[in-house]
């Protein structure tokens, strides 16, 4: 016999606990659903702990809603959904979206939700004015044609698509092109390059050809691409594409007055090819023509952002830069700079330094703090690469340092790296230009060791550290050995500040000796000893990151 309603409890089931996760997966599976990524899962339980109804929340999206067949007469949907809405509000989301099966439409309408888009097996709803407000914003622009792009990153292929689209819709009035073609960037933060970087690359790369508007949660996002409610992933993909296209035809295109949607052809990716085919099938009923532009190709095939990402991942900037317009270069260099900082941080067994395995000699720093610091200074790197004067570069460095201190609660985590990488970004890795820039911007806030290295154009890096790093790059302990090589030759003011000049010279000698007779056991022993003693070669860590960056940039 079913439990009385008053004895049924709604509570969180922590999915990090395997027992609860398996219970939720089994419950959803018995209701024809599958568990998707959620931040919170709430369930109504009977007296024996069995799930009668459940639902998840990911940011502002309600998903994975199900009620067991035996409990469908108990009216559990409304209190469960109300709890999820309250949980979203507590997290700062006043506007909540939901994906559900069409048969659940009335339940959600009774709670103030309205339909945004439909597909045969799903509907997308929300309870606020999010889409209405975004469409109101779009009505401030007028377009004949629309391109929606991720640009992860913006390549010559993207530029070609924009050029061809502008040519199609502008006819003999090239001066009116930007007013007739609108580009909507994908806003979802699931790409190698963050939204703000992709937005800037699109704006710079399409200047004079199109108007770039702000992206939203309503096109190609977690909000329009649900995959939680069907087991068959190919069916789920079909459903999410239909929802996305329906929302564009119902709302986005009319708000802009657009009658054309431009896409690039897709010779290799079946999912994107199917998306293009569905657009051609669905959008004409909304008065929107789909224009497919053949992809730009070179001798190796169609130019794609995935090629660029693969080259960057392997540290091959030259190959990546051959596939992008000059306007994307600062953000690609930024990616390599951030990658270098992350590689240095992620390396374990670094004597006295913070890593994934230890805080080293630091009481005020840990791995999470260093990650926050990297995130805080990242937005300044593209501007450093583009800075037109030494004064502008210097001010950007000051601003980046302030952002770092705000993110870390006043802890100096990356001051030296900001200075060195800023010079390298602006000079594109050219030693003489780095030295010239350093001579113009070095001030009293720059430590003597960092100043001397910069004024030399980082001679030791080019003459010694970079060749050494390349020689051990495939070694299991290549990063640690390169760090020891740097430590053995660098007058590290961080070490001097912590343990004095005499001990600092001894640390240099110890690093050289450890490198000569290297073993993992000796390295581990040194890590423990330096942590206890307070030795932290922070300057060497900055130079290791710079070495990694330069190797990628000059590869």
Give the residues covered by each predicted segment.
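Conserved beta-strand in the GNAT
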Residues: 43, 49-66
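Phosphate-rich cofactor/ligand-interacting catalytic cores and adjacent structured alpha/beta frameworks
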Residues: 333-395, 399, 415, 427-528, ...
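Nucleotidyltransferase catalytic core that binds NTPs
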Residues: 100-333
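Short amphipathic alpha-helix that is part of the acyltransferase structural core
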Residues: 1-34, 46
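Conserved acetyl-CoA-binding loop-helix of GNAT-fold acetyltransferases
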Residues: 73-86, 157-163
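Conserved phosphate/anionic-ligand binding catalytic regions in large, soluble enzymes, centered on
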Residues: 408-425, 534-549
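Conserved glycine-rich acetyl-CoA-binding loop
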Residues: 64-79, 91
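Conserved GNAT acetyl-CoA-binding A-motif
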Residues: 88-100
């Amino acid at each position: 016999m079913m439990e009385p309603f008053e004895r049924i409890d709604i509570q969180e089931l922590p999915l990090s606990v395997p027992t609860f996760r398996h219970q939720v997966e089994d419950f959803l599976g018995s209701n024809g659903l599958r568990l998707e990524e959620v931040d919170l899962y709430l369930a109504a339980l009977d007296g024996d702990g069995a799930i009668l109804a459940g639902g998840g929340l990911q940011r502002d999206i309600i998903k994975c809603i199900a009620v067991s067949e035996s409990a469908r007469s108990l009216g559990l949907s409304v209190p469960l959904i109300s709890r999820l809405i309250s949980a979203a509000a507590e997290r700062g989301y006043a506007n909540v979206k939901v994906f559900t099966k069409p048969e659940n439409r009335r339940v959600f309408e009774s709670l103030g939700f309205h339909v945004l888009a439909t597909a045969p097996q799903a509907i997308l709803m929300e309870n606020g004015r999010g889409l209405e407000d975004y469409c109101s914003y779009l009505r401030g622009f007028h377009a004949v044609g629309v391109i929606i792009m991720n640009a992860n990153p913006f390549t010559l292929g993207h530029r070609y698509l924009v050029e061809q689209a502008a040519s199609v819709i502008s006819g003999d009035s090239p001066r009116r092109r930007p007013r007739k073609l609108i580009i909507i960037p994908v806003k979802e933060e699931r790409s190698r390059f963050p939204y703000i970087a992709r937005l800037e690359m699109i704006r710079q790369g399409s200047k004079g050809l199109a108007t770039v508007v702000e992206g939203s949660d309503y096109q190609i996002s977690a909000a329009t691409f649900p995959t939680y409610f069907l087991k068959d992933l190919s069916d789920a993909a079909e459903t999410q594409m239909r929802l996305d296209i329906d929302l564009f035809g119902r709302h986005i295109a009319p708000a802009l007055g657009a009658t054309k949607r431009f896409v690039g052809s897709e010779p290799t990716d079946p999912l994107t090819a199917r998306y293009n085919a569905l657009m051609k099938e669905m959008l004409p009923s909304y008065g929107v023509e789909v224009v497919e532009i053949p992809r730009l190709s070179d001798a190796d095939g169609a130019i794609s952002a995935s090629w660029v990402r693969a080259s960057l991942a392997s540290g091959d900037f030259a190959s990546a830069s051959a596939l992008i317009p000059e306007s994307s270069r600062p953000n690609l260099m930024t990616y390599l700079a951030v990658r270098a900082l992350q590689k240095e941080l992620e390396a374990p067994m670094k004597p006295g330094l913070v890593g994934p395995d230890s805080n080293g000699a630091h009481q005020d720093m840990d791995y999470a703090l260093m990650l926050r610091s990297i995130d805080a200074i990242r937005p300044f790197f593209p501007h450093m690469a583009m800075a037109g004067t030494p004064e502008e570069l210097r001010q950007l460095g000051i601003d980046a340092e302030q952002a770092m201190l705000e993110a870390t609660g006043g802890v100096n985590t990356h001051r030296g790296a900001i200075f060195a990488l800023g010079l390298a970004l602006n000079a594109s890795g050219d030693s003489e230009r780095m030295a010239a820039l350093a001579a113009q911007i070095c001030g009293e806030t720059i430590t003597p060791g960092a100043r001397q290295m910069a004024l030399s154009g980082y001679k030791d890096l080019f003459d010694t550290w970079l060749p050494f790093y390349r020689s051990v790059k495939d070694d299991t302990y290549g990063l640690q050995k390169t760090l020891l090589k740097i430590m053995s030759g660098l007058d590290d003011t961080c070490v001097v500040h912590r343990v004095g000049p005499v001990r600092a010279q001894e640390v240099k000698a110890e690093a050289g000796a450890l490198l000569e007779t290297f073993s993992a056991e000796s390295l581990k022993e040194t890590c423990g000893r330096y942590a206890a003693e307070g030795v932290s070669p922070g300057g060497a860590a900055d130079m290791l990151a710079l070495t990694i960056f330069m190797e990628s940039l000059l590869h």
